[in-house]
Design a protein with these regions (language model features):
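Residues forming the flavin
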Residues: 1-323
Length: 323
């Protein structure tokens, strides 16, 4: 087979979990490590999280997302850990043969003794919400809007309604306000917020942004561009209550309605998945149903506290035996 390579450990994903796993493996005596990252730089989602609040547990100081990611990148480079950027893994076989492609190397086949899945998670799209209305411009996932503002330098809109009170949505409510947009409200389907209390206070209360619990978007107005949204209160069965509709004019709707693990590779490998989280089922050593294949970070399940996963052991004893 052309371009056949071999590595002791291959880590799919160069975000904080993948970097932490690589550093841990290197410090435990594994020298032959390869990180494969599909983006143009390491760091994962943290590169667009320019707010502070990271690093208190791991580094004992408050850092922004990029600063936090850079700490792990620096450790990986100091340990001479090999990594490929701008590389997409398109298939992994049950015998741990990885097929990847990038512009420099073309199609590559990599045989790994052990694999760590650290692909992270993705946002739940509008299609999963069954919101009536047309499909005008101006509807974004909160993470997409975060990247547009923080990395690309674009404002998604001037008048914004946010559906969902996850932490990304709360943080973007503050960010857009600081950039000059008017955030009309944050609507949350559940009778409680999905974000941290700290973020509710710092991102909504401090800027007088209303949080409407037990409310959801039932209609989107506009054909070419969002012109307004209609929200309604929901009952205990999460069904809209007739007569409670309210319409708000806006040009942008942000969706912050949950994150789901990137599980396409896991499904192709026939790894057993957790029906509640859609991430791989793992044992106490974070090993999946396939021997020698491990998973860590948000690919298991989304957690609002990054340090919960970074503090877990990512190089258990049976992984050391497998390599």
């Amino acid at each position: 087979m052309r371009n056949l390579l071999h590595h002791a450990i291959v880590i799919i994903g160069g975000g904080p979990a993948g970097l932490a796993a690589a550093v841990c493996a290197k410090k435990n005596g594994v020298d032959d490590i390869l990180i494969i990252e599909r983006d143009t730089k390491l760091g994962g989602i943290l590169n667009q999280c320019i707010h502070n609040g990271f690093g208190l547990h791991t580094f004992k100081e408050e850092l922004t997302g990029p600063e936090y990611a850079q700490r792990f990148i620096d450790q990986a480079e100091e340990l001479s850990i090999n990594y490929w950027l701008d590389t997409m893994v398109i298939h992994i076989s049950e015998d741990k043969m990885i097929t990847a492609v990038n512009g420099e190397r073309g199609l590559c086949h990599i045989k790994a003794d052990s694999i760590i899945l650290a692909m992270g998670c993705r946002e739940r799209p509008r299609g999963a919400l069954n919101i009536p209305g047309y499909r005008p411009a101006g509807i974004y996932n909160a993470g997409t809007a975060q990247r547009l503002v923080n990395i690309e330098g674009y404002m998604p809109g001037k008048e914004v309604v946010i559906l969902g009170s996850g932490d990304i949505g709360l943080i973007m409510a503050r960010r857009l306000t600081l950039e000059g947009a008017k955030v009309k409200l944050v609507a949350e389907l559940m009778p409680y917020s999905g974000g941290l209390k700290r973020n509710i206070v710092q991102c909504l209360d401090d800027y007088d942004i209303p949080l409407r619990l037990s409310h959801t978007v039932v209609d989107i107005q506009g054909r070419e561009r969002v012109e307004g949204v209609t929200i309604a209160q929901v009952d205990e069965h999460l069904c809209p209550i007739p007569g409670t509709e309210e319409t708000y004019s806006c040009d942008t709707l942000l969706l912050s309605v949950g994150l789901i693990p990137e599980n396409e590779l896991s499904e192709k490998m026939d790894i057993s998945l957790n029906k509640k989280t859609n991430g791989p089922l793992v044992n106490e050593c974070l090993e999946t149903s396939i021997e020698g294949v491990f998973a860590c970070g948000n690919v298991l399940m989304y957690t609002i506290l990054l340090t919960l996963f970074l503090r877990k052991p990512v190089l258990p004893e049976n992984m050391q035996h497998s390599i």
